[in-house]
Amino acid sequence: MRVIRGRAATPDADRAATRELLGAVADSGTPAVRAWTPHRQLAFGRRDANETGYETARGAARERGFPPVERSVGGRAVAYTGTTVAFASLEPVADSRSGLTDRYEAAVGTVVAALDSLGIDAERGEPPESFCPGDYSVQAPCSTGDGERPEKLAGIAQRVTAGAAMVSGVVTVADREEIGDVLDPVYDALGVPFDPNSVGSVAAAGGPNDPDRVARALEDAIVDGRPTTIERLADPGRET
């Protein structure tokens, strides 16, 4: 299994690297994994781009220091602060029409196992009006001024092409207030219900405030003991 670490020098180049990796998995039949911290950005899903308030939402993101981009998978807008960890598990598939649900279910279990290894009591689910709402999300009790409440830590998406499937997602490590602050006007412009208090983080759930540790935990859970070769992308300014 190929383990790809680091990120490319620009957001566009970084997204291109993942697309190229998906094609390489389809061509070679060798699975691959990435777990890294993307550049600071606000990534909109394809549904967002069709909303009447899309340009207003892009402006709100830009005003708050989050360059807006569009991602190829579905789902709603996601904010990356620079400490947010993304992951992508890429596997060859013989039939692109089957296995979708099984891959989603397995991915939830993998994220829960990774968070468990970091001391977090995570489970499948999400509180109401969460960011990027979906059936395959992970939540955990997070510290608040009034005690603890379940908050969303991770969301999962999937893309399938001829010969390969990519299950990807995002895990909020820290900066939950900043994420809530930028997503609030963005989701409002898109007409999507959103509660900023639904945003959790690994740190608020009692785990490490360290994106490198979170990335390696996700990587280890996805690899699951398989033999690996480690490769690095080109941005020397970031290890993860």
Regions found by a protein language model. Give the residues of each.
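Acidic, polar-rich N-terminal leader regions of halophilic archaeal proteins
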Residues: 1-240
